[in-house]
Design a protein with these regions (language model features):
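A generic structural signal for short beta-strands and their flanking turns/coil linkers
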Residues: 19-21, 34, 41-43, 61-65, ...
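A short mixed-secondary-structure module that forms the rim of ligand-binding clefts
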Residues: 39-74
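Short Pro/Gly-enriched beta-strand edge/turn motifs at strand-loop
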Residues: 5, 17-20, 119-122
Length: 150
């Protein structure tokens, strides 16, 4: 087993490949962790959300976030309890989050979600009311690191 730090490029590669991650926010010194769908583009993560809720309230109070993705590859069984292990990769992101208010920026971010998650070429156009009724969290990445154990 070789543990190694991933390059920034490999960490970004995994960010582009993973389908969901875990967003950590804080309010009143209480951490809050939630699974989310996201897209990555040019040192930003975009997260689709309801307009209200704990994660939105936390971001409005404290914009500092941590975001995590990971993938187990293989469980390694040993003869003794301390010989067990796991082949995996993981990526951590630290940054500042804010809620997009601009209609055009929200639309552009939602198009990134469609590109990543939809396999249909003939989707109907986005309804402006739907765009207004969704929150897009924009995370500016300040630090990204990844680790793998293959």
């Amino acid at each position: 087993m070789t543990k190694r730090w991933l390059t920034k490029e490999n960490s970004i590669k995994y960010l582009n490949e993973a389908f969901y991650g875990h967003l950590a926010t804080v309010s009143n010194n209480q951490p809050y962790l939630v699974p989310v769908n996201y897209v990555y583009q040019q040192n930003h993560l975009y997260i689709h959300s309801a307009l209200q809720g704990q994660k939105i309230a936390n971001i409005r109070e404290n914009s500092r976030i941590c975001f995590e993705i990971s993938h187990p590859i293989q469980l390694l069984l040993g003869e003794k309890p301390c010989q067990f292990g796991m082949h995996y990769w993981s990526v951590l992101v630290f940054g500042q989050a804010h809620i997009l208010d601009d209609f055009n920026l929200k639309t552009a971010a939602l198009k990134l979600f469609i590109e990543k998650y939809s396999h249909k070429d003939n989707l109907s156009p986005m309804d402006p009311n739907d765009i207004e009724n969704v929150a897009i969290i924009d995370i500016t990445i300040e630090n990204i690191s990844g680790k793998a154990n293959y």
